[in-house]
Amino acid sequence: MSHIQIPPGLTELLQGYTVEVLRQRPPDLVDFAVDYFTRLREARSRASTPPAAPPSGSQDFDPGAGLVADAVADSESEDEEDLDVPIPGRFDRRVSVCAETYNPDEEEEDTDPRVIHPKTDQQRCRLQEACKDILLFKNLDPEQLSQVLDAMFERTVKVDEHVIDQGDDGDNFYVIERGTYDILVTKDNQTRSVGQYDNHGSFGELALMYNTPRAATIVATSEGSLWGLDRVTFRRIIVKNNAKKRKMFESFIESVPLLKSLEVSERMKIVDVIGEKVYKDGERIITQGEKADSFYIIESGEVSILIKSKTKVNKDGENQEVEIARCHKGQYFGELALVTNKPRAASAYAVGDVKCLVMDVQAFERLLGPCMDIMKRNISHYEEQLVKMFGSSMDLIDPGQ
């Protein structure tokens, strides 16, 4: 037996099938295997793109979802129910803010003069660079964005300086230009760190959106520079704009199974910090081996998940990408690297036009604490089963290699 060679691709093939069995728990393994491998053959025959590009087509094939992803979580699967969905309020929220929501529609049209803080050309360039990836600004039209940039002011900070303190009234929203900052939450007289900002990101929006005290303390751990936006301008432009976005997204967010363990107020906070991105056919959304910075929920379209094979190479001698999953509307991906703090375990490509709701890593850590247990147990469940049956978990620990 020691001289028997395992054919190239056999391990990956069986791992994909095994994961689907674990996920779907079919009553008849033989019928399920026939259907699974038939669709696998059909998917392969329809693939017509080069090896390194995402396959095209519309097959409903999902041979490895939940395994990597940045693997996918199937909105139709019952995994979350089997994993004891946390009861709202049972787990310690990283941020728990409950208050009456500010309603922009009830506020009279403002007649206050626009706030303008003069800036040099060099300052303006630095500000634009710092704000280019801020999701709260993504849905602003050019005139609104210009007003926001005009109103922002620069603030330099020193080591150990408290930028905001838990329990204080919210006065400003902050965008980080440079510096590192700890996020501290105090509960039952115990203070703990729940995250860190590293030279990019933003904070302070929740207190301004919901008329509530600051939910966390932000302390500078290095010298740094911030751009602040006053409360009045933030509410006049950002909050009103987000109210329109909320009407568009709230029903969709409520339909995502993963988020059903959250309270209504928490789901609304997700709507307020989430952004929308559109991808064209074949466009790469995330890249295997890269650092993770966002979490994705598919609003419309189809996404192909691929990993680099260790046994297949393309004509250039590089590891060939192999499709292991397809995910659709309501499914999410990109969470594995955020939960494990590892590089991306897979790449994701748009199949046709795709629209995703995107949450940055800071908002993910801050708002999805109650869901983290489900995601971690999903990952552990698949890894344990794969190690037990195959002796490995397809290098989820070090996916970039």
From Swiss-Prot:
Molecular function GO terms recorded: cAMP binding; cAMP-dependent protein kinase inhibitor activity; protein kinase A catalytic subunit binding
Cellular component annotations (GO), alphabetically ordered: cAMP-dependent protein kinase complex; cytosol; plasma membrane
Residues recorded with modification Phosphoserine: 48, 75, 77, 96, 347, 392
Region (Disordered): 43-65
Residue spans of biased composition, Low complexity class: 46-58
PTM info: A second phosphorylation site has not been located.
Broad class of the protein's primary localization: cytoplasm
Residues the entry annotates as binding 3',5'-cyclic AMP 2: 258-401
Phosphoprotein recorded as keyword: yes
Subcellular location(s) of the protein: Cytoplasm; Cell membrane
Region Dimerization and phosphorylation, residue ranges: 2-135
Residues carrying Phosphothreonine: 212
GO biological process: adenylate cyclase-activating G protein-coupled receptor signaling pathway
Tissue expr: Four types of regulatory chains are found: I-alpha, I-beta, II-alpha, and II-beta. Their expression varies among tissues and is in some cases constitutive and in others inducible.
Keywords: Acetylation, cAMP, cAMP-binding, Cell membrane, Cytoplasm, Membrane, Nucleotide-binding, Phosphoprotein, Repeat
PROSITE patterns reported for this sequence: CNMP_BINDING_1, CNMP_BINDING_2, CNMP_BINDING_3
Record PTM N-acetylserine, positions in chain: 2
Function: Regulatory subunit of the cAMP-dependent protein kinases involved in cAMP signaling in cells. Type II regulatory chains mediate membrane association by binding to anchoring proteins, including the MAP2 kinase.
Family of the protein in this entry: Belongs to the cAMP-dependent kinase regulatory chain family.
Subunit structure: The inactive form of the enzyme is composed of two regulatory chains and two catalytic chains. Activation by cAMP produces two active catalytic monomers and a regulatory dimer that binds four cAMP molecules. Interacts with AKAP4 and CBFA2T3. Interacts with the phosphorylated form of PJA2. Interacts with MYRIP; this interaction may link PKA to components of the exocytosis machinery, thus facilitating exocytosis, including insulin release. Forms a complex composed of PRKAR2A, GSK3B and GSKIP through GSKIP interaction; facilitates PKA-induced phosphorylation and regulates GSK3B activity.
Record-given protein name: cAMP-dependent protein kinase type II-alpha regulatory subunit
Gene (UniProt): PRKAR2A
